[in-house]
Regions:
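Short histidine/acidic/glycine/proline-rich micro-motifs that form metal-
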Residues: 17-20, 127
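A short, polar/proline- and glycine-enriched secondary-structure boundary/capping micro-motif
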Residues: 24, 130-133, 258-259
Length: 259
């Protein structure tokens, strides 16, 4: 007798891959994930910072961006529904990218309703309310007028500006570490509680903080996704899988279930 085939995974959740040409092993691991795992799920949710940066959809013509978009399109062509929530690195992803990959762009946060279960999906950066400087920056660059003006600049100029922003961000994070204030780069507990209350949900899935873990109590569940880096040792990365029975399983970057 042949063993029964496994139940198809309802959804996979990943974030914070920070894909870039300078990280070829991480890129290869992501492409492997798409070909061997994501293609067998019903839905794939990309919860932000999939790219290290995104200067605009006109960059889709670059070989690297084209490779990633083509790989995602293969997954959607196989019948997997793709969903995208912007991160702080790739919030300029727009309709052209969505059409190329057949991904649906979602608001942050988004509620995923499956049967009686409600799941809050978010990149997670807006929950880091203790980082006041970042929240001010986030508010500014998410405005339609700012994005329109920025995208009107030549692509090369946009990339130069983004490179400068990345350097400033790295220095900002270093300063916070020097001040022993790592807590401001994590989610604010009150902001998380307010989100649970506002959405009448009990499960939250997010990334951004690079602090993977499961925070479970009697009333709520908060799952933090891992960032990815396979180019350095030890390798890290992975995803969360939602099963038909509502359970959530965590997998590491090599595809081993670790929960």
């Amino acid at each position: 007798m042949q063993p029964s085939s496994p139940t198809r995974t309802v959804a996979l959740f990943i974030s914070d891959l920070h894909l870039q040409p300078e990280m070829p092993e991480t890129t290869a691991a992501f492409l492997h994930f798409l070909q061997r795992h994501a293609i067998h799920a019903k839905q794939l949710y990309l919860l932000g910072d999939i790219f290290e940066y995104w200067a605009g959809d006109d960059d889709l013509t670059s070989p690297f961006a084209h490779t990633i978009a083509t790989a995602l399109r293969r997954v959607s062509d196989a019948g997997v529904a793709l969903f995208w929530i912007a991160g702080n690195r790739d919030f300029l992803v727009g309709d052209v990218f969505a059409k190329a990959t057949q991904a649906t762009l979602l608001e942050d946060p988004t509620i995923l309703q499956l049967g009686e279960n409600r799941y809050i999906l978010s990149h997670g950066d807006q929950l880091c309310t203790d980082d006041v400087a970042y929240q001010h920056f986030r508010t500014q660059v998410r405005q339609s007028a700012w994005k329109t003006a920025f995208l009107a600049r030549p692509l090369a100029e946009r990339k130069e500006i983004i490179a400068g922003m990345r350097m400033q961000s790295q220095q900002h994070q270093k300063n916070q570490l020097d001040k022993h204030a790592e807590r401001i780069m994590d989610v604010n507990p009150a902001a998380v509680t307010a989100l649970f209350s506002r959405t009448a949900s009990t499960t939250l899935i997010h990334g951004h903080t690079h602090r993977p873990g499961s925070h479970l109590n009697e009333t709520t569940r908060r799952y933090v996704l891992s960032d990815w880096d396979v180019d350095h040792h030890p390798a890290r990365g992975g995803w969360l899988a939602l099963q038909q029975d509502g359970s959530l399983l965590r997998y590491n970057v090599t595809g081993d279930c670790i929960t």
